[in-house]
Regions:
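The feature marks the mature, well-folded catalytic cores of soluble enzymes
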Residues: 1-292
Length: 292
């Protein structure tokens, strides 16, 4: 978590979820407190949380670690090529070493060498991964290059499912994980933002083929980060972590579909959301086997 959290001007050009605001030490402190409380809340529900401090001033988006690395069953870690130079500075060897010390890690595949060629794939922001059916859902953008996506899918045995998605103003969706999330028994997705009707139907059909219920999200709900959620394993059940902003945007029927399989845990992070990301962005999931 960052002590110098602020809106990243390098990423503002293609992330319309970011809000222009005058940032101060007070807002940075508030964001720090939000992440601290969010971690405590998840731990109280039985989720294992590894929280890292970031006292530097040159990585304003370090609160969003899911973009630079991901972990995978079988002991695999991927490190990703990032578009903004400031975001490349988020990569930390101590995080990878912690994972090696606490979990069984077989190999680390580093794609960051693609950056000088202008090829980017920003982790589980660029891709929403179905770890059960092995599908990588990806909305095309400057941060999701098809070459890098193909390499990842080949290395990690995922089927790529690529589509174009735009908001109501015609602006491309910068990260797939603001548009959709895939849980064990359901998927929430802003289908109306997928521009091609045929491809939209194919995406929905692929999700349904896996046996999942579909929670269709409106554009307004996507704007409220309702798609930026993540399923986690709690002490007694699966939980769906999302923000209080996202929860307030959901309808009763949508909540009922989610709660039929997972307990909803809402985290209050309004300051962090001003920087263009919500709960899913703040969490890098661990799919590795613990050593003990």
């Amino acid at each position: 978590m960052s002590h110098h959290f602020t809106v990243n001007t390098e990423t503002a050009a293609d992330n319309r979820f970011q809000l222009s605001t005058d940032w101060s030490d007070e807002l940075a402190s508030r964001a720090f407190d939000e992440i601290t409380l969010a971690a405590e809340t998840l731990e109280s529900h039985g989720v294992t949380v590894h929280l890292f401090e970031d006292s530097g001033i040159d990585a304003p988006d370090s609160v969003f670690p899911n973009n630079w690395f991901s972990t995978h069953a079988g002991g695999h870690i991927a490190i990703y090529p990032m578009k903004a130079p400031s975001r490349r500075r988020e990569r930390r060897s101590d995080v990878i070493e912690m994972l090696k010390q606490n979990y069984r890690v077989q190999d680390v595949i580093d794609y960051s060498g693609l950056e000088p060629d202008g090829i980017f794939l920003e982790g589980t922001g660029a891709m929403v991964l179905d770890h059960i059916d092995r599908v990588a859902y990806a909305a095309r953008s400057d941060r999701t290059d098809p070459i890098a996506l193909e390499r990842f899918c080949t290395h990690f045995n995922f089927e790529p499912m690529v589509f174009d998605a735009r908001d109501g103003d015609g602006v491309p969706i910068y990260h797939t994980n603001v548009l959709m999330c895939v849980a064990t028994c359901f998927a929430a997705i802003g289908t109306g933002m997928i521009t091609d009707a045929r491809r939209r139907n194919e995406v929905v059909a692929r999700l349904q083929r896996s046996g999942r219920d579909i929670v269709h999200l409106s554009n307004a709900q996507i704007d409220s980060f309702a798609g930026n959620a993540i399923e986690l394993q709690g002490k007694e059940s699966r939980i769906l972590a999302l923000s209080t902003t996202a929860l307030a945007a959901l309808g009763d029927d949508q909540r009922a579909t989610i709660e039929a399989d997972a307990r909803i845990v809402a985290l209050d992070i309004p300051t962090i959301e001003r920087a263009g990301g919500s709960v899913r962005c703040t969490l890098a999931g661990i799919h590795l086997t613990p050593r003990n």
